[in-house]
């Protein structure tokens, strides 16, 4: 990382913390996924932690995963995201996922794993080295309090930045349902590349398949993100200025 990128990273973190403070949000980072599950069980009773971050299926005692939650002024959890490290040095992400895509299913859906499939795109075929997988991204916004605030963008990019501080990965990747991707979430939160049609999940009950894209970033993309302006509404700008 160049000195200029370090300075930009510091500015991004400072501006992010001001934005969080302007919305009376406190971020908490943790490594215990039993604790994460307990937090989400209370905050989102209908949500089941996904298999990639399930404490019953994974051992993260080596520091290969962390989670982030945001807590509002009333003590409510209003955001979550989680990241874990995968090392595919000497191979490619495409090869890894060809063998292990069933480790990344959508939660709470009974799947026909015989029919479900992974299709390697050109991005995954080129990607090798240390990978950070990004998942569990959620923001509670039932009353529209955070709409137009830029929070989803900043929270996601803050997770990317934290991954670089923990592991300095060569790439970061995520899977996103088509209906979410088509609403512009990938572009809005900072993902610069996508492989379409990556995963096809077939429910056992005969419903149509769920199709996902694979969004990803190269290491240099993550360094570039702090240079990209974030659009926020006027109220948020005023709040952030007062929090400075």
Regions found by a protein language model. Name each.
Residues 97-196, 200, 204-208:
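Acyl-donor binding region in acyl/amide transferases
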Residues 1-2, 244:
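Intrinsically disordered, low-structural-confidence terminal and linker regions
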Residues 5-9, 13, 44, 89, ...:
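Serine/threonine-rich low-complexity intrinsically disordered regions
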Residues 5-26, 79:
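Anionic, Ser/Thr-rich low-complexity intrinsically disordered regions
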């Amino acid at each position: 990382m160049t000195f200029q990128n370090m300075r930009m990273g510091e500015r991004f973190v400072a501006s992010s913390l001001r934005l969080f403070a302007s919305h009376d949000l406190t971020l908490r980072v943790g490594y215990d996924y039993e604790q994460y599950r307990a937090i989400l069980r209370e905050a989102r009773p209908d949500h089941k932690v996904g298999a990639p971050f399930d404490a019953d299926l994974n051992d993260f005692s080596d520091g290969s995963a962390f989670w982030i939650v945001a807590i509002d002024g009333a003590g409510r959890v209003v955001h979550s995201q989680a990241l874990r490290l995968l090392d595919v040095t000497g191979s490619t992400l495409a090869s890894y996922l060809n063998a292990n895509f069933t480790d990344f299913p959508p939660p709470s859906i009974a799947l026909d794993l015989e029919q479900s499939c992974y299709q390697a795109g050109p991005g995954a075929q080129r990607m090798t080295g240390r990978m950070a997988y990004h998942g569990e991204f959620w923001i509670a916004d039932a009353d529209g309090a955070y709409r137009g605030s830029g929070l989803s963008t900043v929270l996601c990019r803050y997770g990317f930045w934290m991954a670089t501080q923990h592991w300095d990965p060569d790439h970061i990747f995520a899977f996103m349902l088509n209906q979410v991707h088509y609403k512009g979430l990938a572009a809005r939160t900072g993902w610069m590349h996508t492989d379409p049609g990556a995963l096809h999940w077939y429910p056992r009950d005969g419903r149509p398949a769920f199709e996902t894209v694979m969004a990803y970033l190269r290491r240099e993309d993550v360094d570039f993100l702090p240079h990209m302006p974030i659009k926020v509404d006027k109220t948020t700008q005023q709040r952030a200025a007062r929090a400075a």
